[in-house]
Amino acid sequence: MQPFVLYNSEQRKKVEFVPRKEGHIDMYVCGMTVYDYCHIGHARVMVAFDYIIRFLRSQGWKVRYIRNITDIDDKIIKRANENGETIQQLTTRFIDAMNEDAANLGCLAPDEAPKATEYIDQMQNMIGNLVNKGAAYPASNGDVYFEVTKFEKYGRLSGRKLDDMQAGASERIDVEVEKKHPFDFVLWKHAKENEPSWASPWGNGRPGWHIECSAMSTCCLGNHFDIHGGGSDLMFPHHENEIAQSEASTGEQYVNYWMHVGFINVDGEKMSKSLGNFFTIRDVMEKFHPEVIRYFIVSSHYRSPVNFSDVALKEAKTSLTRFYHSFKAYQQVYGQTTTEALDQSFIERFNNAMCDDFNTAEAMAVLFELNKELNRAVKEEQADQATVLYSTLRHLTNILGLVQHNVDDFLKSDIGQDALALSDAEIEDFIQQRVDAKKAKDFAKADSIRQSLLEQGVVLEDTRQGTVWRRAD
């Protein structure tokens, strides 16, 4: 189990990870508010924590991964009313869609996926504790607010100071006369007509957004756990508020390490519905294989902002297809033969990259070099070395959740390649014509077939076992 460093958003630097319990990592990631289909920003968060967890488990860590579901929220209520359906009908439909999208992207299911509506009692207990400690107060309108001035460390995650902040800095914050301070945030919302509500000591109502994650995370992982993650947009106010209410309630440190995934931009601007540059995962999957989307996400460091475009996805498809071509070239000669003997130099370099704040950009550079060596070994008919390199590459791509599909199925799919002019069957037919031409000593025809295929993006390689082919990179 190799030590690793990660960027802790709270400390604003990379630090060595020290577990609370030897060999174990407890991780909570903020999930989706299920009122619509997941967008490509959600995909990045899902995929990033998926490959992080896959890598940690490959290193021997026992990771407990919790990702919540917000199934009660203003947007959910509004959308259900617009659609003329119940909240449960709406949320069930979009939870199913979310899980389907995640599976298509190759994401493993979390160990638990708690729903907010299943933890109302625990939320009320935490709110009651905060009121009793004087950190929260009921307002005359039936709401209950957290009093930010009672938590001295408020702002430590985002680096903000209350005195410097202005009300309205976030779309999640409303200036209301019931508040003692503009940044006091709601823990319990009083019931409104035709909205779902639960009985509470403060009257009928429903929980605020921030208290949901504090209650679910501490119920699932305890008052103090290792890693909390989410998108960069959640750092303030959501994660800041989680820290305040959790630590004010329990008196313990809430989380040791905070991880935040970078934004996805479109033409240099943050993706958003208001700008009209918003893409759901399903929108993108109509044009690109889901593993191409995963590759696009994996190929950049999780903290770096990335620019989303068709061009970027086409580049991702080209790069991913190289691995599939290499696997096909190997399998044409050696079948599915693998070995437990792996190339430790490539393993070490890959692990070193991933242990440096999960640097997938550097890890992918290692895989491309390994892929090049595999192609060389296959071409030079070095069977033993080819098998070791193939086995190593398969092992490492598995860790990142890449090259997970049947090679022929991926390469034949319309979204796996640009509907290339020649099908696999047509290529095989041309190869047989070339073999027949060589047997007839018609070398001019054989060379012509090779050149014609090359011009159509197909490379032939003659080996002792026969002719193998691959599509050009």
Curated annotation (Swiss-Prot):
Entry's Gene Ontology molecular function annotations: ATP binding; cysteine-tRNA ligase activity; zinc ion binding
SUPFAM superfamilies according to UniProt: Anticodon-binding domain of a subclass of class I aminoacyl-tRNA synthetases, Nucleotidylyl transferase
Enzyme Commission code: 6.1.1.16
Binding positions (Zn(2+)): 30, 213, 238, 242
Origin superkingdom: Bacteria
Catalytic reaction equation(s): tRNA(Cys) + L-cysteine + ATP = L-cysteinyl-tRNA(Cys) + AMP + diphosphate
Gene Ontology biological-process entries: cysteinyl-tRNA aminoacylation
Cofactor mode of binding and number, as noted: Binds 1 zinc ion per subunit.
GO cellular component, one term: cytosol
Residues spanned by motif 'KMSKS' region: 270-274
Subunit structure: Monomer.
HAMAP family: Cys_tRNA_synth (MF_00041)
Recorded family membership: Belongs to the class-I aminoacyl-tRNA synthetase family.
Name of the featured protein: Cysteine--tRNA ligase
